[in-house]
Every structure is written in structure tokens, then in C-alpha cells.
């Protein structure tokens, strides 16, 4: 018989830097999960990713065991890293903070492809371009 899922916890944690302090500790502790076991597993799986923020979905089962799936970094984080900026525009319609090329958009779309709801790379590029527009980043040819 399959284990019955009790809760799903979604977190965004820097790669290789999960520790029991907030937000990880309280989120897992309220469901009775072994926090250190998660931290060790997450850090081992993501240590090669550098300093990127990694979304993770943790499934907690009724017997207090858990499994987790790491996703690709958020598109906004990848865009800001590619454009060498720390923060997006506070008013993206009128204030542009950076420019990014179509080639960089394609690279980011290829990285994000497993997590995007798109069938081909062109559709994925349109999604990433929309995210760039929302952050105040101009896409140039």
C-alpha cells in the first residue's frame, strides 16, 4: 500500500545552505519532520548549484517520513543574474533597469524547460520574456 501524503511544503532555499533556522525549521517542525535529515539531504543534492535559490517541494507522509523534489531556480533569479542586477524595477512599465539578449533568454528557457508549462523552446522563451518585462528588463535582438 502506498504511503498517504499528509502535507506539501513549498520552500525556496539557497543551494547547499539549508539549516534548521527559519524558514526551514518552523515549516518542517510543525509537521513533525526530522529537520536535520532534510537539511543534510537537500545540501548534498544542491551543493553543486552554487549560490542560486532552489525551490523545493517536500511531501510529508502520515508516518512523518518525507520526500522532496528540487525544481529549477526561479526565472526572475536567472534573469537578474544574467543581467547583472540585484533587483528588478519598481515601476517596470516606465523604468527599465537592464537589457538582455535573445540568446540569454534562450539559455534561461532551456534551463527552465522541465518546470515550464510549454511544449517547445519558443513558447518557453515567450514565458521568460514576459517575466523579464515584469522585472523591467528589456529584451534586445
From Swiss-Prot:
GO biological process, one term: translation
Keywords per UniProt: Methylation, Ribonucleoprotein, Ribosomal protein, RNA-binding, rRNA-binding
Pfam families, A to Z: Ribosomal_L11, Ribosomal_L11_N
Keyword Protease: no
Modification(s) after translation: One or more lysine residues are methylated.
InterPro entries the UniProt entry points to: Ribosomal_uL11, Ribosomal_uL11_bac-typ, Ribosomal_uL11_C, Ribosomal_uL11_C_sf, Ribosomal_uL11_N, Ribosomal_uL11_N_sf
Disulfide bridge positions per record: none
Keyword Lipoprotein among record annotations: no
A single MF term (Gene Ontology): large ribosomal subunit rRNA binding
Protein's job: Forms part of the ribosomal stalk which helps the ribosome interact with GTP-bound translation factors.
SUBUNIT field: Part of the ribosomal stalk of the 50S ribosomal subunit. Interacts with L10 and the large rRNA to form the base of the stalk. L10 forms an elongated spine to which L12 dimers bind in a sequential fashion forming a multimeric L10(L12)X complex.
UniProt similarity note: Belongs to the universal ribosomal protein uL11 family.
Protein name: Large ribosomal subunit protein uL11
Source species of the chain: Desulfotalea psychrophila (strain LSv54 / DSM 12343)
Encoding gene, per UniProt annotation: rplK
Amino acid at each position: 500500500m502506498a504511503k498517504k501524503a499528509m502535507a506539501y511544503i513549498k520552500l525556496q532555499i539557497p543551494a547547499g545552505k539549508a539549516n534548521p533556522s527559519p524558514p526551514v525549521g518552523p515549516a518542517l517542525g510543525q509537521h513533525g519532520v526530522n529537520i536535520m535529515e532534510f537539511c543534510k539531504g537537500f545540501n548534498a543534492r544542491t551543493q553543486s548549484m552554487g549560490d542560486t535559490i532552489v525551490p523545493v517541494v517536500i511531501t510529508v507522509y502520515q508516518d512523518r517520513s518525507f520526500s522532496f523534489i528540487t525544481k529549477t531556480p526561479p526565472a526572475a533569479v536567472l534573469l537578474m543574474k544574467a543581467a547583472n542586477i540585484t533587483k528588478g524595477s519598481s515601476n517596470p512599465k516606465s523604468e527599465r533597469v537592464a537589457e538582455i539578449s535573445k540568446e540569454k533568454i534562450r539559455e534561461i528557457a532551456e534551463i527552465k524547460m522541465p518546470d515550464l508549462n510549454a511544449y517547445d523552446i519558443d513558447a518557453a522563451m515567450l514565458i521568460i520574456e514576459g517575466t523579464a518585462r515584469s522585472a523591467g528588463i528589456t529584451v534586445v535582438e
